[in-house]
């Protein structure tokens, strides 16, 4: 049996992405067959395609997030039945119409959760969750600085931090994105194309600084963040959209008793009980509209190159999804 897949034979520009028919693997006893309805595009897909993140074995199917319906289950599968709604992330090769996966690498959705919203929020929502609860536990009255605040993770990070009671400062690259970030809940918004974000953070916090800086930009912002970090604060790096971070002198942190942390969502999906609970908590907030998910645009399967270009050129505000229905 065949399925359409997004595939690369080498890492490089958007034109390395190919739409091809590939074989569906034979189902093992602990695996399920999923019919995907929606795919979620994330910046990790850009990094894996362009070589910023190395892929050990090529050629390979790509993609890291999708939602759909269970079509078939292996004889030893306990958690799912045919017809269940599911979502999953951090499984390389997810950009296929049909996908075979171990039952412990996906989570069940409640019936009140829309599959489109699930594909638009699983990876980014769970990322925002571990960032605000594990990498740094955001507290009431914290000053939180979020780079790329109008992007998918940035929007959810803002809303989650506001639910907790933090003051949120967001950075963006243009005035349109500034309006998006402001409408999404940022207390202050900085356009870093014409303002120095470090000095503006000091101004907005009465020279206190940010308790935590969430940085998915990397090279262009990371070291400058040290200038506006509060005492005992933390910079959390979880992406490198502008390039790899230059080496820094860790002694610069010592006068502030500050710290640096990194984060990766994969670690928080390895224990299925934790993975399922975290997803349930996220989607409860989404269902209750306490966290609102903005979908920027839908593409069809054959438009994957266009979707990559739009995300890589930072033209998107919110989530780009691929519609397979």
Can you annotate each of these PLM segments?
Residues 23-40, 52-93:
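Glycine-rich beta-strand-centered segment in the early N-terminal region that forms part
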Residues 87-148:
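NAD(P)H dinucleotide-binding glycine-rich loop of Rossmann-like/cofactor-binding domains
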Residues 148-149, 217:
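NAD(P)H cofactor-binding loop motif with strongest signal on the N-terminal glycine-rich segment
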Residues 153:
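Hydrophobic/small residue at the entry helix of a nucleotide-binding pocket
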Residues 162-221, 271-275:
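Adenosine-nucleotide cofactor-binding segment
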Residues 172, 220-291, 323-325:
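Glycine-rich phosphate-binding loop and adjacent beta-alpha segment
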Residues 288-294, 305-325:
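C-terminal capping/lid region of NAD(P)-dependent oxidoreductase domains
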């Amino acid at each position: 049996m065949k399925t359409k897949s997004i595939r690369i034979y080498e890492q490089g520009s958007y034109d390395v992405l190919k739409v091809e028919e590939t074989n569906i693997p034979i189902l093992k006893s602990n695996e399920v067959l999923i019919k995907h309805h929606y795919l979620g595009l994330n910046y990790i897909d850009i990094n894996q395609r362009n070589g910023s993140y190395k892929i050990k074995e090529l050629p390979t199917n790509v993609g890291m997030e999708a939602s759909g319906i269970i079509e078939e289950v292996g004889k030893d599968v306990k958690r799912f039945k045919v017809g269940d709604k599911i979502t999953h992330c951090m499984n390389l090769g997810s950009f296929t119409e049909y996908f075979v996966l171990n039952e412990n690498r996906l989570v069940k959705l409640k019936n009140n959760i829309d599959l489109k919203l699930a594909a638009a929020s699983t990876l980014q929502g769970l990322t925002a969750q571990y960032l605000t609860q594990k990498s740094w536990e955001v507290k009431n009255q914290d000053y939180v600085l979020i780079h790329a605040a109008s992007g998918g993770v940035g929007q959810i990070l803002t809303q989650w931090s506001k639910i907790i009671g933090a003051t949120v400062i967001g950075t963006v690259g243009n005035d349109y994105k500034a309006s998006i970030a402001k409408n999404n809940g940022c207390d202050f918004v900085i356009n870093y194309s014409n303002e120095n974000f470090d000095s503006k953070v000091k101004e907005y916090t009465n020279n206190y600084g940010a308790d935590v800086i969430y940085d998915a930009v990397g090279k262009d912002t990371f070291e400058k963040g040290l200038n506006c970090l509060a005492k005992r604060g933390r910079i959390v790096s979880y992406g490198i959209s502008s390039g790899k971070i230059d080496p820094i002198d860790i002694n610069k942190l010592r006068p502030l008793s500050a710290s640096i942390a990194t984060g990766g969502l994969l670690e928080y999906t390895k224990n299925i009980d934790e993975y399922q609970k975290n997803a349930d908590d996220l989607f409860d907030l989404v269902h209750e509209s306490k966290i609102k998910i903005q979908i920027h645009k839908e593409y069809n399967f054959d438009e994957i190159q266009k979707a990559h270009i739009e995300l890589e050129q930072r033209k998107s505000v919110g989530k780009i999804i691929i519609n397979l229905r």
